[in-house]
Amino acid sequence: GDFFMATRVGMVSLGCPKNQVDAEHMLYDLRKEGFQIVSDAALSDVVIINTCGFIESAKQEAIDTILEFCTLKQEGRIKAVIATGCLAERYRDEMKKEIPELDAVVGIGSNGKICDIIREILLDKQAVCSYGAKTELSMEGGRIISTEPFYAYIKIAEGCSNNCTYCAIPSIRGKYRSRRMEDIVKEARWLAENGVTELVVVAQDTTRYGEDIYGKSMLPELLTALCEIDGFKWIRTLYCYPERITDELLDVIAKEDKLVKYLDMPIQHCDKTILKRMNRHGDRETLTALIKKIREKIPNVTLRTTLITGFPGETKEQFEELCEFVKEIRFERLGCFAYSPEEGTPAEKFEDQVPLKDRERRAEIIMEEQMIISDSLNEAALDSEVEVVCEGFDRYAECYYGRSQADAPEIDGKIFFLSEDKVRVGEYVKVKIDDTMDYDLIGSKM
């Protein structure tokens, strides 16, 4: 056993929070088995790259990262490089062929075997490929929190059964399977006891939670149960599917003080024909009605959405309609992606692919529109008072920065603020907004 005691393991986790949670579970297992966890992967003996395989740019980032560490291995600075996560799951055969320097390629279903895999490659130097069935939930057991100490993600389900035609996630992650409510609550309690004050609830589709094991969506009940845990100040839910946003869910968000008035609802498009070809539902009218209802039920709600431009068959007219919709709705937060044709998805085989430069240009146009909207919403926030959680001190700008309820960690903007007193990371303070800067706000502690 002593042979491995001194083995230092570094983890680089790419992509979304759901992937990060997987990484945190692996780190916990490694530490429990006596491996040393180091925060700077370049200083480790074994590097695990927990990859994202979602769209082209994410795959490129993953491959670049792997190659970067393979170079360190060739220089003799590290002993082994392991790929885990979505890309490893998705391109299991190609990966080992294309990047022979990899010591192990580990699929999503084999994350639980990570300690054995490391021992194996260090002992007999044979490359390992390991894939397990994706039916189990790998989320029980402990984690090592890798985010800022005051917030953490909690994954309530694995996989997805929406089968949108552009998306490879169901084939990578398997079909939707919910965790038992008592397991989630137990993990959340543990997070609260460890100083987490902001809990971020994630899954590929949080609104589907419980359908597979309880026969109906249990997200409202789950959120209510999480609100009863002492220690949490803000509870945030990401990745809500528009058709599953029920009155019951909206009422719970409106009623519970701890639930932040923030809804992340990717709609992808507003055109009926395109949504249908995406294997999604609704149209401009139903979406407009839903958003109106959300804003009535939850006054001052922050709405975040995601759009795809240049989906196969998107005409100029349909794109212009999307622009009009964006202008009309005025989402508080918006991300837009140029469509990326993914291997093995139905949309990749659709005849009428839109040229890449048009897809990208359309995304730029939407983001330019959104910039104007953000500016005017920020303008409206001037002189208001907001509660901000401090995330740190920016030496360059010589001020503190943090987020309000309206900003999700890692994806939304920041609030920079001056303060005469020292403010601790994770402390919640009242800030008066004095100025704006692109997507960020500037203020002073009251």
Which stretches of residues belong to each language-model region?
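Active-site proximal loops enriched in glycine and acidic residues that flank catalytic Cys/His/Asp
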Residues: 203, 239, 267-269, 305-309, ...
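Contiguous mid-protein beta-loop-alpha structural module that forms a pocket-lining wall or clamp
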Residues: 314, 321, 329-331
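Terminal RNA-binding accessory module
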Residues: 349-446
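Conserved, mostly hydrophobic/aromatic
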Residues: 184, 201, 237, 265, ...
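Proteins enriched for Cys/Gly/acidic motifs involved in redox and nucleic-acid/cofactor modification
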Residues: 4-209, 248, 259, 263, ...
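Radical SAM enzyme [4Fe-4S]-AdoMet core and its adjacent flexible, acidic
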Residues: 16, 210-227, 231, 277-278, ...
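Short, hinge-like loop/turn segments at secondary-structure boundaries
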Residues: 99-100, 121-124, 217-219, 253-255, ...
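Conserved SAM/AdoMet-binding glycine-rich loop
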Residues: 80-85, 90, 193-317
